[in-house]
Amino acid sequence: ALVYECMGSKNQTGPIFYEGFRGEFEQVSAKDNYYNHYIYQAWQHWGMAMGNPLFTGPVYNKDGRIMFANNRINAHHLGISGTPGKEWAYRLLLTYSRNWGTYDNPFDDVKKQFSSLLEVTYSPVKWNGWSFSISGAMDRGNLLGNNSGGMLVIRKTGLIK
């Protein structure tokens, strides 16, 4: 299976538009400030973004503010999965994003982030219901920093005999 997704929120409702005449601006349109609101707290749950993981949630704010400090993003995501044999499966996820902050608090420079995950699963036919997975993930960039991690999973479904 193959999936490609692209997402863009850099131009929220288009360019900034000043509504008015003769130099008097009654309203400024655009700059919607996705996931943030001036009355209620940001669209988040326990500091994490609800709906789109690419929006950097409030949990990442060093000053403790409940707001999204980065909601202007252009991103590309590629996912590939397959089963090359009866007992083997794999999954590869790759995401690249360019981040501009918010309209009110833009980043000085565009922040770039690359994230990846590779997972391989072995499900031996002779051991009904058992599977073993190993996965590794990494982030590289100047938005969230450089991080790496891994996971080993031993899973049994059904009754243990």
Cite the ranges covered by each PLM segment.
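Exposed, low-structure sequence patches enriched in small/polar residues
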Residues: 1-161
